């Protein structure tokens, strides 16, 4: 129920945990991205006790060549090297260049119409959003598959992402891997499933 608008139907079902026991929706907000409206909610989830699971724990190494290598032998590829994302990245570069030319023409007083400029800007935004969604979906599926094995604990390295971003040769590749998003979502999923998450420094013996 949105103030001044009333009840609004959401396109996707099941994303907001309205029927899960112990889950409490605390607040919400509506935003617009690439001409689409999105709702974000803050949800309080119950503290599930860490289970005394007889299964072994696993370790996860995140990287640039491969996205994640799990100690159980499973490897998750770097999706940014897939043909699909490479094609979309090339499209994005072309559309960004076209947008830059339209801005330059506008500054020079040439006949670029503002409507055409906004149209091209929306194309760039939509492509950015599409690429982000593909990466986020891959992270969600990777985490779901890892957690599904029901390890007693999961160990990951406390990556210095800020330090890695300072390397101009690696910054773009690091940003596209979304390591922080992976860690944040993994923490939430482990908490939900009662799995202990161990975040260790790079010198931790494993």
Provide a role label for each language-model segment.
Residues 1-33:
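Acidic carboxylate diad motif detector
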Residues 20-21, 33-206:
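Positively charged, helix-rich recognition surfaces that bind polyanionic ligands
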